[in-house]
Amino acid sequence: MKLSPATKSFIGKTVDISTFAIQWGFVPFVVYLGFKKGAEPMPNGQILPLSAMSLLWG
């Protein structure tokens, strides 16, 4: 299938713009999702007693 030069140029520009948007938009998007969801609840600080029996049989 032959593509005209205008179509090739359009596809090239589209790929360039998409690459730019993905490269520069990924980190801000992840930060946005982190702020939107919020932090996980903090642990209550309770110290669990560990022994060989609790490690083996829960």
From Swiss-Prot:
Places the protein is found: Mitochondrion outer membrane
Principal subcellular localization: mitochondrion
Membrane topology, Cytoplasmic segments: 1-16
GO terms classed as biological process: mitochondrion organization; positive regulation of protein targeting to mitochondrion; protein import into mitochondrial matrix
Record-linked InterPro entries: Tom7
Topology in the lipid bilayer: Single-pass membrane protein
Stretches of the chain found on the membrane's Mitochondrial intermembrane side: 36-58
GO cellular component: mitochondrial outer membrane translocase complex
Family listed: Belongs to the Tom7 family.
Subunit organization: Forms part of the preprotein translocase complex of the outer mitochondrial membrane (TOM complex).
Protein name, per record: Mitochondrial import receptor subunit TOM7 homolog
Lineage: Eukaryota, Metazoa, Ecdysozoa, Nematoda, Chromadorea
